[in-house]
Regions:
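A short tyrosine-centered beta-strand micro-motif
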Residues: 69-75
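Repeated loop/turn-to-beta-strand initiation elements of outer-membrane beta-barrel proteins
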Residues: 173-176, 191-193, 234-238, 266-270, ...
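Outer-membrane beta-barrel transmembrane domain signature
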Residues: 185, 246-338, 344, 359-361
Length: 361
């Protein structure tokens, strides 16, 4: 009751931020977003305060009546005047922006790197430099990685581990991440459409197991198709897509419907995911079936039909020194009964993991 009767005490306790821009733009609206949670900062959504800077950023802005605590500031140039931070197909901001603490992310923004303490009654000045995320031509990543997979095939080697180069290119409209590529076709804010391509390794070599001998090796191939990305409330991302064999080696394709959400734990960004993967009849037959001409007593003819499997996994990202970053991705695919029942299969699930240390240029 005492605090209610003495409102000036609130003014004494309230903190204030003054936000200035090192390089105010010649035109456009500059927007300040204030965050107090890593769960929303990681994908730059749902800030606790949003204000436009006066005079297009040439005059510092003020955020008043703040409680003491930990905050992070993001400032962006609203180039098209739509009142929101535009992002590309994979969720990277496509408008110039800047962060408190002179922080510049090397991947998903990390809250502790941009966060600062604000004490009761304190007035703190934050200066930010605006810069485009992609520069003039996007950025490249180069490093070393290791992939590890298990085989579901009867009598085959359980684990396969091999080193690979980790190469990537990230641009506003085009992204190449290892063996996958995307090109943006349509961006409507929370919904985006892209053309996609991916390299699919052959499922097996006949020398992998005596149960596969005489069936011939399965060829690598190139898939191509389309994908839809939808940003849902609370930071969930829904993706759906289909890719078909462009080289005609399997005459089939795969569809995918998945959900993913990013969390932060300290300096780690952790993104659990779950997906349903559809394998067309011809692709399932190519990778899991046994043609009648190749049947034998211990390997009867088998036609699995199309199949839907469940995939559960996660990706972990951590910024290291300067432009270096660490990426770990792992998933397990649970095979449906019509694939598990194949005479050349003796596993009910497949593990797949990828680890890399890369540098961004």
């Amino acid at each position: 009751m005492l605090a209610i009767n003495m409102p000036w005490l609130k003014n004494v306790e309230a903190a204030e931020l003054i936000i200035g821009i090192d390089n105010p733009p010649s035109s456009g609206t500059v927007i300040v977003m204030l965050f107090n949670s890593s769960s929303t900062f990681v994908d730059l959504r749902d800030p606790v305060r949003v204000i436009p800077l006066p005079s297009g950023g040439t005059t510092p802005g003020r955020i008043l009546d703040l409680a003491s605590g930990e905050y992070a500031v993001v400032v962006y140039l609203d180039e098209n005047g739509n009142g929101r931070l535009d992002k590309n197909f994979i969720g990277i901001p496509s408008e110039p922006l800047g962060f408190s603490n002179r922080y510049w992310p090397q991947g998903p923004p990390t809250y502790p790197r941009a966060a600062f303490k604000l004490e009761a009654g304190e007035t703190k000045t934050i200066d930010v430099k605006l810069q485009p995320v992609f520069g003039k031509s996007g950025f490249f990543g180069l490093g070393v990685g290791v992939i590890s997979t298990t085989s579901p095939y009867r009598g085959a080697k359980t684990w396969d581990v091999q080193p690979i180069p980790a190469i990537s290119y990230i641009g506003d409209r085009v992204q190449i991440l290892g063996l996958t590529a995307r090109g943006s076709l349509l961006n409507l804010g929370d919904f985006a459409l892209a053309a996609t391509a991916s390299y699919r390794f052959g499922a097996y070599c006949e020398k992998d197991s005596p149960y596969l001998q005489g069936m011939g090796s399965r060829d690598d191939t190139l898939l191509g198709g389309f994908a839809l990305q939808a940003r849902l409330p609370e930071g969930f991302n829904l993706s759906a897509g289909y890719e078909h064999d462009l080289l005609g080696r399997t005459s089939g394709g795969t569809g995918r419907l998945g959900v993913e959400k990013a969390f932060q734990q300290g300096l780690l960004t952790i993104s659990p995911k779950i997906a349903f993967n559809w394998i067309t009849d011809k692709l399932a037959d190519y990778e899991y079936g046994v043609p009648a001409a190749q049947a034998r007593p211990d390997r009867p003819a088998y036609h699995p039909g199309d199949a839907v499997n469940l995939e559960v996994g996660f990706t972990i990202f951590r910024e290291l020194y300067k432009n270096w970053q660490l990426i770990l991705s792992s998933s397990v695919v649970f095979l449906p009964s019509n694939l598990k029942n194949s005479p050349i299969v003796d596993q009910s699930h497949v593990f797949d993991s990828f680890f890399a240390v890369t540098r961004r240029f």
